[in-house]
């Protein structure tokens, strides 16, 4: 998806967020674009992520609390994964989760770059009240 498409998708996703929400965001270029939009549109959020790109875009924003989930660093994804990330997400609960998978199929569901990322994303889905 091109950058403009990611921006439009990110703007639409913001309609489901309100100041004060606790949200989780996964990894990838769409997630990074989403973080840029969040920074502009909101004054007070708690954001949980295992993405370095999302963290870098949101850190330092007054009114934002950022929780960076650690684990085994995956340089190609610029994200933390593995058992540490999985166990951390099991201990957390958030209002909404925003997953930006590599592909979505009506038949097969979401697909991402690897099993390690998929395991973490599945746990994120289980830890949220609402999934986007």
Positions of predicted regions on the chain:
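HTH-adjacent hinge/linker in prokaryotic transcriptional regulators
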Residues: 1-24, 36-46, 60-63
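Sparse, context-dependent recognition of short Cys/His-centered cofactor- or disulfide-binding micro-motifs
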Residues: 2, 8, 32, 43, ...
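Electropositive phosphate-/nucleotide-binding environments in soluble metabolic enzymes
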Residues: 3-7, 11, 28, 48, ...
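Short acidic/polar alpha-helix capping motifs at helix-coil junctions
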Residues: 18-22, 49-53, 86
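General beta-strand structural signal in soluble alpha/beta enzymes
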Residues: 24-27, 47-50, 68, 99-100
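Phosphate- and divalent-cation-binding pockets in alpha/beta enzyme and binding domains
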Residues: 26, 32-34, 56-57
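Conserved phosphate- and dinucleotide-binding cores of soluble alpha/beta proteins
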Residues: 53-132
């Amino acid at each position: 998806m091109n950058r403009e498409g990611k921006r439009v998708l990110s703007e639409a996703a913001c309609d489901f967020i309100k100041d004060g929400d606790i949200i989780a965001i996964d990894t990838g270029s769409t997630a990074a674009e989403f973080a840029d939009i969040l920074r502009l549109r909101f004054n007070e959020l708690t954001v949980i992520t295992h993405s370095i790109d999302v963290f870098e875009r949101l850190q330092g924003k007054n009114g934002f609390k950022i929780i960076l989930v650690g684990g085994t660093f995956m340089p190609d994804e610029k994200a933390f994964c593995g058992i540490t990330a999985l166990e951390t997400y099991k201990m957390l609960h958030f209002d909404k989760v925003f997953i930006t998978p590599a592909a979505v199929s009506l038949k097969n569901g979401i697909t991402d770059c690897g099993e390690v990322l998929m395991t973490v994303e599945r746990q994120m889905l289980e830890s949220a009240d609402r999934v986007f």
